[in-house]
Amino acid sequence: MFMTYQPKKRQRKKEHGFRKRMSTQSGRNILKSRRQKGRKKLTA
């Protein structure tokens, strides 16, 4: 067995970053709900 999580900063930002979230309606809904909840960090 090997470790399946091989972290990459660029890939993480591309998939879960702020601009990616803003690009779709559902992504904006995610940000909205996280703001309402009072999350310190909205995105990765």
Swiss-Prot record:
It comes from the Bacteria. Keywords: Ribonucleoprotein, Ribosomal protein. One of its GO terms (biological process) is translation. One of its GO terms (molecular function) is structural constituent of ribosome. Residues 7-22, 31-44 have a biased composition (Basic residues). Residues 1-44 are annotated as: Disordered. Belongs to the bacterial ribosomal protein bL34 family. This is Large ribosomal subunit protein bL34. It comes from Clostridium beijerinckii (strain ATCC 51743 / NCIMB 8052).
